Amino acid sequence: MSRSDWEVVIGLEVHAQLNTASKIFSGASTAFGAEPNVQASAVDIALPGVLPVLNRGAVERAIRFGLAIGATVAPTSVFARKNYFYPDLPKGYQISQFELPVVQGGTITIRVGEGENAYEKTVNLTRAHLEEDAGKSLHEDFHGMSGIDLNRAGTPLLEIVSEPDMRSSAEAVAYARTLHALVRWIDICDGNMQEGSFRCDANVSVRKKGAEKFGTRREIKNLNSFRFLQQAIDYEVQWQIDTIEDGGTIQQATVLFDPDTGETRMMRSKEDAHDYRYFPDPDLLPLVISPEWKARVQGEMPELPEAMKARFIEQLGLSAYDATTLTASKEVATYYQATVDAAGAALAKPCANWVMGDLAARLNKAELDIAVSPVSPAQLAGLVARIADNTISNAIAKKVFEALWNGEGASADEIIDKQGLKQVTDSGAIEAMIDEVLAANQKSVEEFRAGKDKAFNALVGQVMKASKGKASPAQVNELLKKKLAG
C-alpha cells in the first residue's frame, strides 16, 4: 500500500507567551535570562496562604487575539485547576481554563506553497485559553539529581488550539508561520522561538483515504522551530503508516522529537482530560469581559494583515503576490507603508520593488531587520522619486542606494548633487557621444546592419560607458536606432 492511500490528520496546539512585564497571577518579572529562581514570588512558589491576582494585560492580549481571528470573546470564562504532579509545578496543579475558555472558535487563512501550485486554506480554531507556564527542570549541571528553576513558573501563556484541519506537514508549517506572524503583528507575543516564547505541539494521526473516523493520535511536544515541526510530522506520519501496515496498532501517546536523529520517541502514554481532574479554581472569580472593555480593545487594534493586503491590492494596484510578501511581517508592512506615504501612491509599485528587491537583499546580506535599516523609508521614497522623474537611471539608483546605506548623504538628492550623478537627457549631448562610439566601433555597426542584434546591445553599452552611466538608457536606445537606420 502506498503513501497516497493514507490521509494525514494534523491539529496544532501552540503556546504563545504573552509579552506582559509581569506574570499572570503575580507581580514577578517575566524577563528572559535571569539567574535561576530570582524571579519567583511567593505566589509562584506556592507558599501557604498566598492568593493569585489576575494580570489585566494578559486578558487584554487574549481579547486582542480573539478579535483578530474573528472568534467569540466569551463574556464570562472560568479558570480551572489542572491537577498533575511534576517537580517544576510547586502547587501540584496548573491554573488554566477548561470548559469555558476566553476565546472560542475563529479562523486563520493560510497560504501553502509557492508559484502556480500555491493554494489558500482556512483552518478553524477550537479555542484559545489563558494559563500559567510551569517552571523548568535542570539536568545538565547536576549529578544524580535535578535542579528546579521557577523563574518561568506563572509566565502568562495563551494556548491556541486548532481543529484537526491540516492534511500535510506543509499545511501545518504554513499555519504555524501565519499564526506566528499574527501574534507578533498584534503585539501580544514576541515570537522568539529560541527562548520558548512560541512553542508548538502537533497532534498527528493517519487514516485510510475516504475514512470518516479519525485514527489514534500521537502528540509531538515542544517543537520550537518550523523546520523541526515539518521534520517531526513527516517522520511521525511515516512511522504510523509503517506500524499499521506491519500489523501493529497505534497507541495514544506523547512523544518527543530528537533533531539529531530526526526521529520521534515515546515520552509517556497520552493523558485524557479526566486524568487531570479539572475543576474551577476557587481562588479566582469568573473572568467577566464587558462589551465596553471589548470595544475599547477593538478600537486599539492595528490594521490586520488580511485587511492591509486587500487595501494594497485594491488601492495601490499591487499584485496578490506583492501584497502577500509585504504583509508577511508587521515591520516590512510598516516600512513599505511609510515609503509609499512619502513617495505618493502613484509610485506604490516601484516602492514595492525596491523594498522586496534591493533593500531586502542588502538587509539579508547584513543580517539586519528592516526596523533598523540604515536607509529610512523617506530616503528610499526620495530615491524612487528621482528614478520616476528621470533624474537618474536604475543603474545609477543602485549606486545612490549604496551611498545612502553607507551614510554618505542625508538624501538621494544630496548624493546625486554631490557626486554629479544626474542623468544626461540632453539629446545633443547624447547624439555627440553616439557619433563618437559609432566612429570608433565600425565593426559593431557592420554586424548590426548584417542582422546581429547583439551588436546593438554592445553599442548601447559603449554609449553608457562613455556617459559614465549617466545617459538616459531610453534616449540612448531611441537615438542610436535612428542613427543606425540613417
UniProtKB/Swiss-Prot annotation:
Question: What catalytic reaction does the record list?
Answer: L-glutamyl-tRNA(Gln) + L-glutamine + ATP + H2O = L-glutaminyl-tRNA(Gln) + L-glutamate + ADP + phosphate + H(+); L-aspartyl-tRNA(Asn) + L-glutamine + ATP + H2O = L-asparaginyl-tRNA(Asn) + L-glutamate + ADP + phosphate + 2 H(+)
InterPro entries per record: Asn/Gln-tRNA_amidoTrfase_suB/E, Asn/Gln-tRNA_Trfase_suB/E_cat, Asn/Gln_amidotransferase, Asn/Gln_tRNA_amidoTrase-B-like, GatB, GatB_C_1, GatB_Yqey_C_2, Gln-tRNA_amidoTrfase_suB_CS
Q: Which residues form the signal peptide?
A: none
An example Gene Ontology biological process: glutaminyl-tRNAGln biosynthesis via transamidation
SUPFAM superfamilies in the record: GatB/YqeY motif, Glutamine synthetase/guanido kinase
**Record's Pfam families?**
GatB_N, GatB_Yqey
Q: Which domain of life is it from?
A: Bacteria
Task: Give yes or no: UniProt keyword Protein biosynthesis.
Answer: yes
Which Enzyme Commission number(s) are on file for it?
Answer: 6.3.5.-
- Alphabetized UniProt keyword annotations: ATP-binding, Ligase, Nucleotide-binding, Protein biosynthesis
Q: Which GO terms describe its molecular function?
A: asparaginyl-tRNA synthase (glutamine-hydrolyzing) activity; ATP binding; glutaminyl-tRNA synthase (glutamine-hydrolyzing) activity
Broad class of enzyme this protein falls into: ligase
Give a yes or no for keyword ATP-binding in this entry: yes
- Subunit structure, interactors included: Heterotrimer of A, B and C subunits.
Described function: Allows the formation of correctly charged Asn-tRNA(Asn) or Gln-tRNA(Gln) through the transamidation of misacylated Asp-tRNA(Asn) or Glu-tRNA(Gln) in organisms which lack either or both of asparaginyl-tRNA or glutaminyl-tRNA synthetases. The reaction takes place in the presence of glutamine and ATP through an activated phospho-Asp-tRNA(Asn) or phospho-Glu-tRNA(Gln).
Q: Please report which protein family the annotation says this sequence is part of.
A: Belongs to the GatB/GatE family. GatB subfamily.
Q: What is this protein called?
A: Aspartyl/glutamyl-tRNA(Asn/Gln) amidotransferase subunit B
Quote the gene name from the UniProt entry. Answer: gatB
